[in-house]
């Protein structure tokens, strides 16, 4: 098993080792690589720009003047596979500071050697050429280390014996002298030239004034001619414009009339269409619904009529059936009552006095209830008699009057019934 290692574009990943003593090396930057456990080794080296500041102090030039020179260099490890392999071979495992020290010492050595071949003026006055020369000389050496010089510039040049300042003062004095001479000659030439220019200016001015006057006179004459011609053309154009305007107005009016006629025809057609639409709308919204409503009402009336007829027929049939049923009931009741009366009569004839006695006994409770009805309102009855035999005689008197009362109420003569006769002791 192993691990997947990733690396950004500012670093290079070096994977070495492998199975069976393999010496294959893989260089990756801005990507990923696979490394086996225990048998593969992974290391990283920076590809970022390194800023160096080489400094050479008191280095004698070709003229023997001691100068101190400082510069700024931008270097980085190259990413070409062969050069990256060279750089990894020499710097892998070292930190950035160690790499910078190696390159810095190389640049300072070349800078010292080049200073010894140039004069102070060449170094001071043409710094770009001096820096270019350093780059060209140092580039092959650092290139063999896998390092690329991106830029190299001279930062400062100075000395401790004021050679540069003296050189500057001398040059400044020469320049100042030449400047004063140049100013005097320029002022002299300027005065002469100014006078000549004034003379030429006056000559030119006089000639110009003459030409201006001639041109002005010719201009006024030409202007008058042009004005007259313009007025004529203007009048003709105005007349032609008015005539053309009148013709155009006539055409416009004619077209307006034609447009009005067409619009009126279209309006008439639209009104006719509107009348047809309104008629159809009235038919659809008023007439058809009214006809439908009338038809619906007619159907409802006919249905109601049929309903009432059927209801009347049903009611008549109902009344007839009820009448027939009631008549049948009355007839059955009459027949039953007649049969009952017939059976009673036969029973009375068959059983004689016993039947009559049963009839009397059946009627007696009703009679007693009618007789006793007034007594229900009496709280108590007090019999006043000084003799016990008097009470007995009163009871016998009431019993003796009972047959007459029954005969009056029912038409039955109890005195003719032997059992009652014996009980009451009535003599016929």
From Swiss-Prot:
Name the reported effect of residue 19 to S.
Partial loss of ZDHHC5-catalyzed palmitoylation. Complete loss of palmitoylation
Result of altering residue 20 to S: Loss of ZDHHC5-catalyzed palmitoylation. Partial loss of ZDHHC5-catalyzed palmitoylation. Complete loss of palmitoylation
Q: Which InterPro entries match?
A: Band_7, Band_7/SPFH_dom_sf, Flotillin_fam
Name the UniProt key words of this record, in alphabetical order.
Cell adhesion, Cell membrane, Endosome, Lipoprotein, Membrane, Myristate, Palmitate, Phosphoprotein
Q: Provide a Gene Ontology MF annotation, just one.
A: protease binding
Q: Give TM regions.
A: none
User: What's noted about post-translational modification?
Assistant: ZDHHC5-catalyzed palmitoylation predominantly occurs at Cys-4. ZDHHC5-catalyzed palmitoylation may be required for the formation of higher-order complexes and for neurite outgrowth in cultured neural stem cells.
Its placement in the membrane is given as: Peripheral membrane protein; Lipid-anchor
- Please report which positions carry a covalently bound lipid of kind N-myristoyl glycine: 2
Q: Pfam families, from UniProt?
A: Band_7 (PF01145)
Q: Which GO terms describe its cellular component?
A: acrosomal membrane; adherens junction; basolateral plasma membrane; caveola; cell-cell contact zone; cytoplasmic vesicle; dendrite cytoplasm; endocytic vesicle
**By its UniProt entry, which SMART domains does this protein fall under?**
PHB
- Please state where this protein is localized: Cell membrane; Membrane, Caveola; Endosome; Membrane
One Gene Ontology BP term is:
cell adhesion
| Entries under SUPFAM superfamilies matching the protein | Band 7/SPFH domain
Q: In which tissues is it expressed?
A: In skin, expressed in epidermis and epidermal appendages but not in dermis. Expressed in all layers of the epidermis except the basal layer. In hair follicles, expressed in the suprabasal layer but not the basal layer. Also expressed in melanoma and carcinoma cell lines, fibroblasts and foreskin melanocytes.
Q: Which residues carry this modification: Phosphoserine?
A: 405
Lipid modification (S-palmitoyl cysteine) maps to 4, 19-20
Q: What is its main location?
A: membrane
Q: What does this protein do?
A: May act as a scaffolding protein within caveolar membranes, functionally participating in formation of caveolae or caveolae-like vesicles. May be involved in epidermal cell adhesion and epidermal structure and function.
Similarity comment: Belongs to the band 7/mec-2 family. Flotillin subfamily.
Q: How does it assemble?
A: Heterooligomeric complex of flotillin-1 and flotillin-2 and caveolin-1 and caveolin-2. Interacts with ECPAS.
Looking up PANTHER family in the UniProt record yields:
FLOTILLIN-1-RELATED (PTHR13806:SF46), FLOTILLIN-RELATED (PTHR13806)
Q: What is this protein called?
A: Flotillin-2
The major lineage groups are: Eukaryota, Metazoa, Chordata, Craniata, Vertebrata
């Amino acid at each position: 098993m192993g691990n997947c290692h990733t690396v950004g574009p500012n670093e290079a990943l070096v994977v070495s080792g492998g199975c069976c003593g393999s010496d294959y090396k893989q260089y990756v930057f801005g990507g990923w690589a696979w490394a086996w456990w225990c048998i593969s080794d992974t290391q990283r080296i920076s590809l970022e720009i390194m800023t160096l500041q080489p400094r050479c102090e008191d280095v004698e030039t070709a003229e023997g003047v001691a100068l101190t020179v400082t510069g700024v260099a931008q270097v980085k490890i190259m990413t070409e596979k062969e050069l990256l392999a060279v750089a990894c071979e020499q710097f892998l495992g070292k930190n950035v500071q160690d790499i910078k020290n190696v390159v810095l010492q190389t640049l300072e050595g070349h800078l010292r050697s080049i200073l010894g071949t140039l004069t102070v003026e060449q170094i001071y006055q043409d710094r770009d050429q001096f820096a270019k020369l350093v780059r060209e000389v140092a580039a092959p050496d650092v290139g063999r280390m896998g390092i690329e010089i991106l830029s190299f510039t001279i930062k400062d040049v100075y000395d401790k014996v004021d050679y540069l300042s003296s050189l500057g003062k001398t040059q400044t004095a020469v320049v100042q002298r030449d400047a004063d001479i140049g100013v005097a000659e320029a002022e002299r030439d300027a005065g002469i030239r100014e006078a000549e220019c004034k003379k030429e200016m006056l000559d030119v001015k006089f000639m110009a004034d003459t030409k201006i006057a001639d041109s002005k006179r010719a201009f006024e004459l030409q202007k008058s001619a042009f004005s007259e011609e313009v007025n004529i053309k203007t009048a003709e154009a105005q007349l032609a414009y008015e005539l053309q305007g009148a013709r155009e107005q006539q055409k416009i009016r004619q077209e307006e009339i034609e447009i009005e006629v067409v619009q009126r025809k279209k309006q008439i057609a639209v009104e006719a269409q509107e009348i047809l639409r309104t008629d159809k709308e009235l038919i659809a919204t008023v007439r058809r619904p009214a006809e439908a409503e009338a038809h619906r009402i007619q159907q409802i009336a006919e249905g109601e009529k049929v309903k009432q007829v059927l209801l009347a027929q049903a009611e008549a049939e109902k009344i007839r059936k009820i009448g027939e049923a009631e008549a049948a009931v009355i007839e059955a009741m009459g027949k039953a009552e007649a049969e009952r009366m017939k059976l009673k009569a036969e029973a009375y004839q068959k059983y004689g006095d016993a039947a009559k006695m049963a009839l009397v006994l059946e009627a007696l409770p009703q009679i007693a209830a009618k007789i006793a009805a007034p007594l229900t309102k009496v709280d108590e009855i007090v019999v006043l008699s000084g003799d016990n035999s008097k009470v007995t005689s009163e009871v016998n008197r009431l019993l003796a009057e009972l047959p007459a009362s029954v005969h009056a109420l029912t038409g039955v003569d109890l005195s003719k019934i032997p059992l009652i006769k014996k009980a009451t002791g009535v003599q016929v």
